C-alpha cells in the first residue's frame, strides 16, 4: 500500500503549524524548545517526502545532517534553560530578564 506524498506534506504542514503556535503562544522555555524541534522535524519530513518522490537520495542525506544539528541544538538549548533556571528560578520566558544583573 503506497501513501501519496500529499499526505506526508499535509502532516508536515500540520506539525509545523503546531510548532509555530507553540513558539508564539507558550511561555515555558522548555515547551518553546520542544516546539522548535517539532518544526525542524516537520521540515525534515518535507525533505524526505520530496527526496523520495524525486528519486534522489541527497535529500535524505541532508536530513541525517539536520537531525545531528537538531540534537546539538536541543542539548545546547536545554543547557541554557537549565542555567537560566538556576540563576532566575523560573523557565517562564516573560519573567526572564538576563540584562537585569
Swiss-Prot record:
Quaternary data: NDH-1 is composed of 14 different subunits. Subunits NuoA, H, J, K, L, M, N constitute the membrane sector of the complex.
Keyword DNA-binding: no
Gene3D superfamilies: 1.10.287.3510
Protein name listed in UniProt: NADH-quinone oxidoreductase subunit K
Recorded GO MF terms: NADH:ubiquinone reductase (non-electrogenic) activity; quinone binding
Gene Ontology BP terms: ATP synthesis coupled electron transport
Cellular localisation: Cell inner membrane
Native organism taxonomy: Bacteria, Pseudomonadati, Rhodothermota, Rhodothermia, Rhodothermales
Keyword Cell membrane: yes
Amino acid at each position: 500500500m503506497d501513501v501519496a506524498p500529499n499526505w506526508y506534506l499535509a502532516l508536515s504542514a500540520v506539525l509545523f503549524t503546531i510548532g509555530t503556535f507553540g513558539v508564539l503562544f507558550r511561555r515555558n522555555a522548555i515547551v518553546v524548545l520542544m516546539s522548535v524541534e517539532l518544526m525542524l522535524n516537520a521540515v525534515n519530513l518535507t525533505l524526505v517526502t520530496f527526496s523520495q518522490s524525486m528519486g534522489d537520495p541527497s535529500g535524505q542525506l541532508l536530513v541525517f545532517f539536520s537531525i545531528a544539528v537538531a540534537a546539538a541544538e536541543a542539548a545546547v538549548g536545554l543547557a541554557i534553560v537549565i542555567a537560566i533556571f538556576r540563576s532566575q528560578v523560573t523557565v517562564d520566558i516573560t519573567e526572564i530578564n538576563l540584562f537585569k544583573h
